[in-house]
Curated annotation (Swiss-Prot):
Name this protein carries in UniProt: Thymidylate synthase
PROSITE patterns in UniProt: THYMIDYLATE_SYNTHASE
Stated family: Belongs to the thymidylate synthase family. Bacterial-type ThyA subfamily.
Assigned EC number: 2.1.1.45
Keyword tags: Cytoplasm, Methyltransferase, Nucleotide biosynthesis, Transferase
Superkingdom: Bacteria
Subcellular locations according to the entry: Cytoplasm
Pathway(s) where this gene product acts: Pyrimidine metabolism; dTTP biosynthesis
Top EC category: transferase
Gene from which this protein is expressed: thyA
Length: 318
């Protein structure tokens, strides 16, 4: 057993001490560090944080959503996952059809104005309910555009046909494991202007040696307190699922970040997290009857012995 989150704790502490204070797209402000790397040996356990509770169910449903090639939040809402709500809601309130209360800068205003936050939460709840109840509304306003699911599984070529990058990379791993081209990318410059949020985890590459498979992720932008813990667990889970399908043992997850940042309104939460003593990392259980990534459902993926400290809440910068 091991404490696999230590590289994350070391990096977030380094950013607090050595990072540069910068402005950002959301208007919140960040403390930022450029060019960082963390390594996690997945043969020793599963690298989910224990210094705060990380909701593994949300990570599972989001990854399954990506792997389905889905880009509509309806699937997520059906699994009580609200990670992407704000991005779809932003499209709705900026549309000509929206006639409700003014939602300009709802992300920042909801943090500083309690009365507005009540109005915002009520509108967001109505929006989610309508996505679930109204299929046509969901098709129009629940779709986030060319986000991860589309790029991973339906990359559009110039001739109008599509590339399934996940299927292709699995075939490469099986048939040519020494290839240096086992890459999946989500960054398409043509789609950046129309995407709800241009991909943060831009590309990942697989590497096979001695019967073990590793993956390295390049992430252009990482919200260290809220987003990155999800990304670590998500790619660790993805690697385990790919290892299952290809008959390999898991090796390392290597996480390389461009702009690794802590939002200024997360500083106190980070300090609280760093004051806690981490527990040993849990183990991942995958249903042994499932051999292919498309076969996995929520109940086929579990954590064993996940002991953790309490939740630390923090606002999302949109």
């Amino acid at each position: 057993m091991a404490i696999l989150e230590q590289p994350y704790l070391d990096l977030i502490n380094k950013i607090m001490i050595e990072g540069h204070d910068k402005n950002d797209r959301t208007g919140t402000g960040t403390r930022s560090y450029f060019g960082a790397q963390m390594r996690f040996d997945l043969s020793k356990g599963f690298p989910i944080l224990t210094t705060k509770k990380v909701p593994f169910g949300l990570i599972k449903s989001e990854l399954l959503w990506f792997l389905r090639g889905d880009t509509n939040i309806r699937f997520l809402l059906e699994h009580k996952n609200h990670i992407w709500d704000e991005w779809a809601f932003k499209n709705w309130v900026n549309s000509d059809e929206y006639t409700g209360p003014d939602m300009t800068d709802f992300g920042l205003r909801s943090q500083s104005d309690p009365e507005f936050n009540k109005i915002y939460q009520a509108e967001l709840k109505k929006f989610d309910r309508r996505i679930l109840d109204d299929e046509n509304f969901a098709k129009k306003y629940g779709n986030l555009g060319d986000v991860y699911g589309a790029q991973w599984r339906h990359w559009q070529k110039r001739d109008g046909s599509f590339i399934d990058q996940i299927e292709n990379v699995i075939e490469q791993i099986k048939n040519n494991p020494d290839s240096r081209r086992m890459i999946v990318t989500a960054w398409n410059p043509e789609d950046v202007p129309t995407s709800a949020l241009p991909p943060c985890h831009v590309m990942f590459q697989f590497y096979v040696v001695d019967g073990k498979i590793s993956v390295q992720l390049y992430q252009r932008s990482g919200d260290m307190f809220l987003g990155v813990p999800f990304n670590i667990a998500s790619y660790a889970l993805l690697l385990n699922m790919i290892a299952r399908e290809t008959g390999l043992q898991v090796g390392e997850f290597i996480h390389t970040l461009g702009d690794a940042h802590i939002y200024s309104n997360h500083f106190s939460q980070v300090k609280e997290m760093l004051s806690r003593k981490p527990y040993e990392s849990p183990q991942l259980w995958l249903n042994p009857e499932k051999k292919h990534i498309e076969d996995f459902d929520m109940q086929d993926i579990k954590l064993v012995d996940y002991k953790h400290h309490g939740t630390i809440k923090a606002p999302v910068a949109v």
